A protein has these predicted regions:
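Active-site-proximal specificity loops/subdomain of glycosyltransferases
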Residues: 2-49
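Membrane-proximal basic amphipathic "stem/tether" segments
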Residues: 239-326
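Short aromatic/hydrophobic "clamp" motif used to bind/position activated sugar donors
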Residues: 55
Length: 326
């Protein structure tokens, strides 16, 4: 409410009372806010106005280059026996549906259960209702500053400087499945386990289909990597990309399924991680929003150093293989 919509072209206008926003972190030239309550409220109010069998929830700044995503809606129909919730699987994006994440406080990558992309979702309206409508708005600022509260300061959040109880994507995913399955529980984002991750893996592949840009035709100008997810750099290793989704589908849903993709980044994760660092610097170099100074840094520092590190890792790997053969 109160937004100037005089220049917008729309069929139905949904105005909501603003639940407000909360500051996540502040830098010299930038402030980052948690707008999760705004997103959740507008999504729920939008679904109330939707009148057709199918619905699509998406960011207003996403660009649809085609309707290719519809070709996948009736694929991957098989399901496993556990955590079947939706009437039909929901389509969503690889960015940022996470398997694990790398943060500075942890030596190894950390699993992130129920972190499902909130960029866009397409499916039966009744299934999107199941996913969102009973999810409650959170109490702020306690939610966003959760790991700064006295009782939680000793906990290790997987999200680094961000101190929220859950990332928005994880809050939506976890809330939905926790209220529908009694054996799913997380106190906060630091409360994860291999057992819980196993439940999430089954829930995800039984209820969602994860697509990359080349399958969906949907991207976001704000993130140039959304046209080629490998340009997200080393975090690509931790995403539920289409290759990982196909493998999970074969494991949990249909062991006769023939995988159609091949991803060299996962055949050797260490080398894949190193190679993706090069991709990340190339992405920054080609990003139109990158300053000239930053482009020069990528060209003469970032790319050469990351490429050299990758070549060193390749040589180490090759030397190790030769020793084993001898």
């Amino acid at each position: 409410q109160g937004t100037d919509v005089s220049k917008l072209d729309y069929d139905t206008l949904v105005l909501c009372e603003d639940p407000g926003t909360t500051l996540i972190e502040e830098f010299t030239h930038k402030k980052t806010y948690n707008n999760m309550n705004r997103q959740l409220l507008t999504t729920k109010e939008g679904l109330k106005k939707a009148t057709r069998k199918y619905a699509m929830k998406l960011r207003s700044d996403l660009i649809l280059t085609s309707d290719n995503f519809l070709e996948y809606f009736d694929k991957f129909e098989a399901r496993g026996n556990n955590y079947n919730l939706f009437k039909h699987k929901i389509l969503t994006d690889v960015l940022f549906t996470r398997y694990n994440i790398k943060t500075g406080k942890f030596e190894n990558r950390v699993i992130i259960p129920f972190h499902i992309s909130d960029w866009w979702l397409f499916g039966l309206k009744e299934d999107l209702n199941t996913y969102f409508m009973d999810t409650e708005l959170v109490k702020e600022p306690e939610f966003t500053r959760y790991f700064n509260l006295e009782d939680n300061r000793e906990k290790l959040s997987p999200y680094g400087r961000a101190r929220f109880k859950f990332a928005p994507e994880q809050y939506f995913g976890y809330s939905c499945f926790a209220r529908n399955f009694d054996d799913i529980y997380m106190e906060d984002a630091a409360d994860y386990s291999e057992e819980l991750m196993e439940k999430f893996r089954q829930a995800l592949v039984n209820n969602f289909i994860i697509l990359e840009f080349k399958q969906s035709g949907i991207y976001l100008n704000k993130y140039p990597c959304s046209k080629n997810e490998k340009f997200s750099g080393d975090q690509y290793i931790g995403l539920y990309n289409f290759w990982r989704y196909e493998n999970e589908y074969k494991k949990y849903c249909d062991n006769t399924y023939e995988i159609t993709t091949k991803d060299s980044f996962f055949e050797n994760e260490k080398l894949g991680y190193s190679k993706l660092r090069v991709y990340k610097h190339i992405s920054k170099l080609t990003d139109s929003s990158t300053t000239c100074t930053a482009k020069l840094e990528q060209l003469f520092i970032g790319i050469p150093i990351s490429a050299m590190c990758y070549l060193i890792d390749v040589l180490k790997e090759q030397l190790g293989t030769n020793k084993e053969q001898k």
